[in-house]
């Protein structure tokens, strides 16, 4: 399915969307979190500001301009199996400061940053209304996220959407990640009476959410609010 279907969610058309999902006979809705329901860009910006201020950085925007694309690249490498989660977490901040000729302990910085980002639970406008509508329609709602357990758990606890979820499946805790089929297989093992034909994956990432759903044999909806062209093989 194309992005227009889920794009309507952020225009207070949750009831219409719920009706469409009902027609398609889904029961289990698997939502990606970051960039789908949780506003990661805002969360990251606030957390980085506090973190960099603590480190005595004065040129905060300059550091952000380097870190943000570098971090995205590391997450892409993780999705493709080029690096491990430990490498990503424990080296991204040492790489950041090394770029500015400053030596820092990456693992120590990771823990400090984690304290800031875990407090950020910002969601997109309309997210709670959508989930409320789907909950009233008796869907089982689950989170399916690639991320760090302490961070994602903290952010959800600080959000207004946590009560709508039956469970949050986090890649670090599961020992596997999207787009691996094993990620979805482990989800299926933990949900009572789970049926692939009644499950729908909803997310913003073609390479993680949609490709992962394809690998596992699930239907999916690509959340594409920026109306990006799909130039991938997915």
Region spans (language model):
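A short, Lys/Arg-enriched amphipathic alpha-helix followed by its capping loop at the start of a domain
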Residues: 51, 130-137
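Generic recognition of short, well-ordered alpha-helical segments
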Residues: 42-46, 125-129, 154, 181-182
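N-terminal helical cap/lid subdomain that shapes the substrate entry/recognition surface
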Residues: 23-125
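Hydrophobic, well-structured mid-protein blocks that either form specific transmembrane helices
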Residues: 119-131, 141-144
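A generic structural signal for short
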Residues: 81, 118-119, 140-141, 197-198
């Amino acid at each position: 399915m194309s992005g227009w279907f889920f794009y309507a969610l952020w225009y207070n058309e949750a009831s219409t969307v719920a009706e469409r999902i009902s027609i398609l006979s889904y029961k289990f809705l698997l939502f990606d979190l970051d960039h789908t329901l949780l506003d990661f860009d805002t969360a990251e910006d606030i957390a980085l500001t506090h973190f960099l201020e603590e480190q005595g950085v004065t040129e905060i925007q300059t550091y952000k301009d380097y870190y943000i694309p570098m971090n995205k690249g590391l997450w892409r490498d993780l999705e493709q199996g080029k690096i491990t989660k430990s490498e990503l977490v424990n080296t991204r901040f040492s790489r950041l400061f090394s770029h500015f000729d400053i030596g820092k302990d990456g693992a120590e910085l990771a823990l400090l940053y984690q304290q800031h980002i875990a407090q950020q639970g910002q969601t997109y406008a309309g997210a709670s209304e959508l989930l409320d509508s789907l909950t009233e329609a008796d869907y089982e709602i689950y989170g399916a996220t690639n991320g760090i357990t302490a961070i994602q758990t903290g952010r959800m606890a600080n959000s207004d959407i946590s009560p709508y979820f039956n469970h949050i499946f986090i890649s670090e805790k599961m020992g596997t990640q999207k787009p691996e089929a094993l990620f979805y297989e482990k989800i299926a093992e933990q949900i009572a009476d789970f049926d692939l034909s009644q499950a729908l994956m909803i997310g913003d990432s073609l390479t993680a959410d949609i490709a992962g759903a394809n690998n596992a044999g699930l239907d999916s909806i690509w959340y594409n609010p920026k109306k990006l062209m799909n130039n991938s093989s997915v």
